[in-house]
């Protein structure tokens, strides 16, 4: 009998993730973050040049609404184009979005009950630095 290769822990969406997502929407401002990213994405998609950036805003909006139980990883086939768009994104908006999420994360981390939400803001911050070439995973 061949031994199975261990592939790491399998993370499934749990009831805790569901409960934390509900609390995130109500207390953590998840609905506001989602609306901000949706509005920015819609405005960016009005121009041909802004469409790739608008699509990234839509990705961030989805994660902004229900961040618990979701993660992101490098997309297969992400290459030079993703790198170039990430550099442009970083210079134009990425740094400011990152700083806003870090400030919110630190503020939430100061309260005991806000620590799980602080981790989500730090996750947003990392994704906001370079969203191109990343894909969301459950």
Please report, for each region that a protein language model flagged, where it lies by residue.
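Membrane-interface extramembranous regions at the lipid-water interface
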Residues: 2-37, 53-86, 117-138
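Short hydrophobic membrane-inserting alpha-helices and related fusion/pore-forming segments
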Residues: 42-51, 99-117
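Residue-level detector of functionally special positions within alpha-helical transmembrane segments
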Residues: 29-30, 47, 94, 111
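Residue-level marker of motif borders
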Residues: 24, 36, 42, 88-89, ...
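Structural signature of transmembrane alpha-helix termini at the membrane-water interface
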Residues: 26, 91, 103-110, 123
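Loop-to-transmembrane boundary segments
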Residues: 79-102
